[in-house]
Structure formats: C-alpha cells, structure tokens
Curated annotation (Swiss-Prot):
<dbReference type="InterPro" id="IPR017451">
    <property type="entry name" value="F-box-assoc_interact_dom"/>
</dbReference>
<dbReference type="InterPro" id="IPR001810">
    <property type="entry name" value="F-box_dom"/>
</dbReference>
<protein>
    <recommendedName>
        <fullName>F-box protein At3g19470</fullName>
    </recommendedName>
</protein>
<dbReference type="Pfam" id="PF07734">
    <property type="entry name" value="FBA_1"/>
</dbReference>
<dbReference type="InterPro" id="IPR036047">
    <property type="entry name" value="F-box-like_dom_sf"/>
</dbReference>
<feature type="domain" description="F-box">
    <location>
        <begin position="1"/>
        <end position="44"/>
    </location>
</feature>
<dbReference type="InterPro" id="IPR006527">
    <property type="entry name" value="F-box-assoc_dom_typ1"/>
</dbReference>
<dbReference type="InterPro" id="IPR050233">
    <property type="entry name" value="A_thaliana_F-box"/>
</dbReference>
Length: 382
C-alpha cells in the first residue's frame, strides 16, 4: 500500500460505501489521512451519488432510541423483504450501522433533525440533556449546552437550519406556548430569545423537516371558545430572517388531532405530506409544486392514495407515519409499528397498489421510528 501511486489507493477507497468508511479509517492511519483529504472526499461523494442515482440511497432512521444508517434499494418497483435477522442480500431495506456514539451507550436519542448533511441529535439520560450536531461523513461532533433539561417523553421542538446571508447554521428551540422560542447561532456560540408572539402553536407530537435551510412543521391555531374544530396548516421558520412565515394551506381539509399527519421532503426541492383520517383507513400522500417560506402550491394529482383496510389490516391506524417517497419508482415507504406495537415495520406502498411490509425487529413501545433523508456533506463543524 505504501509503495502504490497515490491515485490508485484513492481510486479504490472512492468505491468504499459510505457505511463502511468509519471501519476503513480505523484500519490504517494512511487510509484515514487520505479519506479526510478534501479532494478525496469530493470524489468519494460524487461516486456515492452515482450509486444512489443508479439503484439505492440512504436514510437515517431513529429506532428504539438509537440512530442507524439504512440502505434502501427499490429497483424496478420490485420489493423483496427479509427479516432484520436475515443476511440475505435481496432485502430492500438494510440496517447498515449504528451511526452515533456519544461515549455513553446508555444515552438515548429521542429526536433527530437533518439539515445539509448534518444531524441534530437530542440525547436524554436520567441526569442530563445533550444536544449534539454531527457530520456522519467526517465523524465530527459539536456539543451544545441545552437551555432546558428534558424528560425523554416531554413535548418539545428542535430544528437545525441555515442562515444564507451569514453562511452559518442555527438551532431553533420551542417547548410550549408559554415558553419563549430560543435560537442558537453557531458563529456567536450563544442562545438568545426570539421576539415572537404566536397565534398558533407547533404540533409538537409531529416531527418537522428541513428544506433549503428552513424548517417546516404542522401547526394549528390557538384554541378559543368559539372554535368548533381544529385548523391545521404548515408553518415555516426562515433561519435567515429568523421569522415564522404565514400559515400555509394543506392539500386536505378538516384535519383533527386524532388524524395521522406527517411531513417529509424529496430531493431537497419539495415538501411531501402524508394524511390518514382516524375514522377512515385511507392513506394519501401529496407533493408540493412550489414551496417557499411564504407560499405553497400542491400538485393537482395526489402522489399516492391507498386503502390500508385492504392492504394492511381492517383496523390499522398509523400512529406517526414517518416516511419518504421515491418519485421515479412511484413508491412510498412508511415507518411505524405493527398493530400490537411490538415490532418496527417499514410499510412499502406502490402507486400501482403493490404492498410489502419489512420487519425491522422488536420495538420499544415508547419509541416510534423516525426516518429522514441523508445526503453526505463536507461541512466542517468548528
């Protein structure tokens, strides 16, 4: 290895899957140095993108309070499944590696938020809360002092975003409507209060999503005695102006808090929403045609509409329905639990009516799986 021309080992290492990069770095000091070189990293990520475009892509999955990198292969609209204990290479969803180690195997990860190839992880133990921003590609982490000590099952919202004018990442924190929103600037290394008096509150039971450096959540109007129904909408936080945008309409009406709603993104270009009414076993997914902090429009045709009663169970109701879609292959993958809440399941729906369920193993009853897209990044954490 030491006598080989530099470009030869670089060419070989470029073909290593992203999921195997960490053990390769620990094998040889020279390989580790080479893999952390900027020119190599650009070639490696370009090679990974070619592979992703060709047949498979990666997502980050939080499951049982741990974070994993999942490899997904949905070739030719043919979905083959295997149990998590199977070593079969035909499985369309594979748990490649546990992603994060905080130096404490007892530390549970209760929330994950992805932005620009960075992961914001909220880690909670009985004695402390930790905020960690992590770049999985470099293996770099940055710890932040939290402003509040949480219980694992508290309701709160965090988001990671990007200030385009200052080229700086920021963290937004919200707890309840009675607590002020706080924002953390990576450059100043300080938390500060935001001057916001909302006429709404974030629906904190539902996870938000990052798109183009901004964050989006489901929200609803503050309760008043004259309200006869819930009014849900999308809400954007612009990390550049540090302001919330106006309520953005959803493609469905009359949602209530018992319904299942989830938001995702596709190709870092558009938002996607999932909706299942609590009293009707119909699952619908829509994709935006335009999305900005102050405006949204939806494709006139629903991306996917299926009957869970026919495909899954006569009485099946998704709980959180964290998901992603593949527009080209016309497939949606929804992560949730089984009917008894004992197993983690990936439900794979095709727009043509096809269906498969991939068993991901035993489930911690108090932790629902959460999936987000993952695109490797060369961003350095200072």
């Amino acid at each position: 290895m030491y006598n080989l021309p530099r470009d030869l080992p670089e060419e070989v290492l470029c073909r290593i899957p992203l999921t195997s990069l960490r053990p390769v770095r620990s094998t040889c000091k020279k390989w580790s140095t080479l893999s952390k070189c900027g020119s190599f990293a650009k070639k490696h990520l370009a090679q990974a993108k070619v592979l992703a475009d060709a047949k498979e892509f990666m997502v980050v999955l939080m499951m049982n309070f741990r974070v994993y990198l999942m490899r997904v292969n949905l070739q030719n609209n043919v979905v083959e499944s295997s149990s998590s204990s199977s070593s079969s290479s035909s499985s369309c969803i594979k748990r490649e590696a546990k992603l994060i180690s905080l130096g404490d195997e007892e530390a549970d990860i209760s929330q994950v938020f992805h932005c620009d190839g960075l992961l914001l992880c909220i880690s909670i133990t009985e004695s402390k809360t930790r905020l960690v921003v992590w770049n999985p590609y470099w293996g770099h982490t940055r710890l932040f002092e939290p402003t509040h000590q949480f219980n694992k099952f508290d309701s709160y919202s965090y988001a990671l975003g990007y200030d385009k004018s200052r080229k700086s990442h920021k963290i937004l924190r919200g707890i309840t409507c009675l607590d002020p929103f706080k924002i953390y600037d990576f450059n100043s290394d300080l938390w500060r209060d935001l001057d916001v008096t909302p006429e709404w509150h974030l629906w904190q039971m539902l996870h938000g999503v990052s798109l183009k450096g901004n964050a989006y959540w489901f929200a609803r109007e503050n309760y008043t005695e004259t309200m006869d129904t819930d009014h849900f909408f999308l809400l954007c936080f612009d990390f550049t102006s540090e302001t919330f945008g106006p309520p953005l309409p959803l493609p469905f009406e009359f949602a209530v808090s018992e319904d299942t709603m989830s938001v995702s993104s596709v190709r870092e270009e558009q938002l996607v929403v999932l909706y299942q009414p609590w009293d009707y076993l119909q699952l619908d997914i829509w994709v935006t045609s335009k999305i900005e902090p102050n405006a949204v429009s939806w494709n006139s045709k629903v991306f996917l509409s299926v009957s869970l009663k026919q495909l899954v169970s006569p009485q099946f109701q998704l709980t959180f329905g964290s998901f992603f879609i593949d527009e080209e292959k016309k497939v949606a993958v929804v992560f949730d639990k089984d009917y008894d809440n004992k197993r983690n399941i990936a439900y794979i729906f095709g727009v043509d009516g096809s269906f498969k369920a991939v068993d991901l193993g035993d489930s911690d009853r108090k932790c629902f799986p959460l999936v987000c897209s993952y695109v490797p990044s060369l961003v350095q954490l200072n």
